[in-house]
Amino acid sequence: MSTVFALSNISKFFGKNNELPIITNANIKIKKGEIVALIGRSGSGKSTLLHIAGLLDTPSSGNIFINNIECSNKTSDKDKTFLRRHFLGFIYQFHHLLQEFSVLENVMLPQIIIGKSKSIAKKNAMEILERVKLQDKFSMSISQLSGGERQRVAIARSLINCPLIVLADEPTGSLDNNTAFEVFSLLQEYAKEKNIAIFLATHNKSLAQKACRIVEINSCMLSSVD
């Protein structure tokens, strides 16, 4: 299968004089439909790498390739926004759902942002809510949902625009183990059906084993885990 996402020689340094390396020369290619788990101890740079991958943070050096479109630290904010909206999906440990919106409105939002009509956005949102088993709760507020249900809303929102890749930063970290596997299975099933790649940062080693392959950040370096 073709490569839909790649990091090439990505480095990130912090400090006044860039004296603190967080990531050094990270390279990875992710194919269409592939699930790649990213592991590493707390503070190793997993979230930083995913933020760079999602064009939410700028690398000190290196390039990101999304659908063969090159993106560097010189890429304009306008172009980054376009790439995020049309090619990327995001899921976080803390769902970042809009509390004042209903379940349906939260899931519709990415479609509205890219210019879909409300009627089409609503139709697509209801279809994907059915896939994550929340179609009966579309009118509820986020505060009325359980933690697992909120993450299912976050998954639906991340997938509604059929991105090339979903970047998931500890998406099940706040859930109990059974709920975590249930939520991940929903994500995995839909992504497989639509051939969507997933780059998943997790502390859950059992969850990581369900990926196609595992990579690890250790001492600022990214390497494959056999």
Curated annotation (Swiss-Prot):
Highest taxon of the lineage: Bacteria
Pfam families the UniProt entry points to: ABC_tran
Keywords associated with the record: ATP-binding, Cell inner membrane, Cell membrane, Membrane, Nucleotide-binding, Translocase, Transport
Parts forming coiled coils: none
EC code(s) of this entry: 7.6.2.-
Entry membrane topology: Peripheral membrane protein
GO MF assignments: ATP binding; ATP hydrolysis activity
Gene Ontology CC: plasma membrane
Residues the record lists as binding ATP: 40-47
Annotated CDD domains: ABC_MJ0796_LolCDE_FtsE
Residues of the ABC transporter domain: 5-225
Transmembrane spans: none
Subcellular location: Cell inner membrane
Stated role: Part of the ABC transporter complex LolCDE involved in the translocation of mature outer membrane-directed lipoproteins, from the inner membrane to the periplasmic chaperone, LolA. Responsible for the formation of the LolA-lipoprotein complex in an ATP-dependent manner.
Family, per entry: Belongs to the ABC transporter superfamily. Lipoprotein translocase (TC 3.A.1.125) family.
Subunit structure: The complex is composed of two ATP-binding proteins (LolD) and two transmembrane proteins (LolC and LolE).
Name of the molecule in the record: Lipoprotein-releasing system ATP-binding protein LolD
Native organism: Ehrlichia canis (strain Jake)
Designated gene of the protein: lolD
